[in-house]
Swiss-Prot record:
Keywords in alphabetical order: Glycoprotein, Membrane, Transmembrane, Transmembrane helix
Cleaved signal peptide residues: none
Residue spans crossing the bilayer: 200-220
Annotated organism of origin: Acanthamoeba polyphaga mimivirus
Protein name: Uncharacterized protein L448
Membrane topology: Single-pass membrane protein
Residues with attached carbohydrate: N4, N75, N84, N104, N170, N175
Localization of this protein: Membrane
Predominant location: membrane
């Protein structure tokens, strides 16, 4: 259960929102529920008598969601005064962005529907009968869900990359340490070989000197 319509709008699916609205969860006075249901029945009768505004009727002229010709009464219909005007079919009587009460044109022509309803109940009643607004609302929710899923997937990818990069750093450090140790060993081996060579040269030199001394002594003794 949500404390206000804004929280429900951002966190609740479309059908669950409309279900909670129809049950009067957002009403300050629960006794208004029966009055709202009565208003909804009256609204149904009005729409049945006037199929132009009954979007479930086959006689209504539905506006495609792919076209950018659907507007909001509260923002764009101040100049429309005739319900029979062809322009009126291109407007939806609820502004979900600001959640304000319907425009006076709605109150004027449909007083039994909107005069006693809260703005939440009026929106719910309209969504129940208007395939266009329900489709738009569903499209908005789907876009929000898709955007959130993209953010979650991107976040997971970033975390995977971040977890993978330290392992590469550790591997690079271990390889560097191994190379350094091998270089040190090679240097030690080379230095040891040089020492042996030097010692061998010295020994050979001493032996040669001794042989020369012996030869010289023998020569002198003769």
């Amino acid at each position: 259960m949500y404390s206000n319509i804004t929280k429900a709008w951002h966190e609740d699916p479309v059908k669950e929102i409309t279900s909670k609205l129809s049950k009067g969860y957002f009403n300050a006075n629960k006794n208004n529920k029966f009055e709202n249901e009565r208003s909804s029945e009256i609204s149904d009768k009005i729409l049945d008598k006037n199929p132009k505004y009954n979007f479930l009727s086959t006689e209504s002229d539905l506006v495609s969601l792919t076209e950018n010709n659907l507007h909001l009464l509260s923002n764009n219909s101040a100049h429309i005064s005739d319900l029979n005007s062809s322009e009126f079919g291109n407007y939806a009587p609820v502004d979900f962005a600001t959640k304000i009460k319907p425009h006076n044109i709605s109150n004027k022509h449909l007083p039994l529907v909107s005069s006693k309803d809260s703005e939440c109940d009026f929106s719910m009643n309209h969504i129940k009968h208007c395939n266009i607004c329900y489709g738009r609302l569903k499209e908005l929710i789907n876009n929000k869900v898709s955007k959130k899923m993209d953010e979650i997937i991107l976040d997971n990818k970033i975390k995977q990359i971040q977890s993978f990069v330290p392992s590469l750093d550790n591997l690079s450090k271990s390889n560097l340490t191994t190379d350094q140790s091998m270089n040190n060993q090679n240097r030690n081996t080379i230095s040891n070989n040089d020492l042996w060579k030097t010692a061998l040269i010295i020994i050979i030199g001493i032996v040669i000197i001794l042989l020369l001394i012996i030869v010289m002594i023998k020569t002198v003794c003769k």
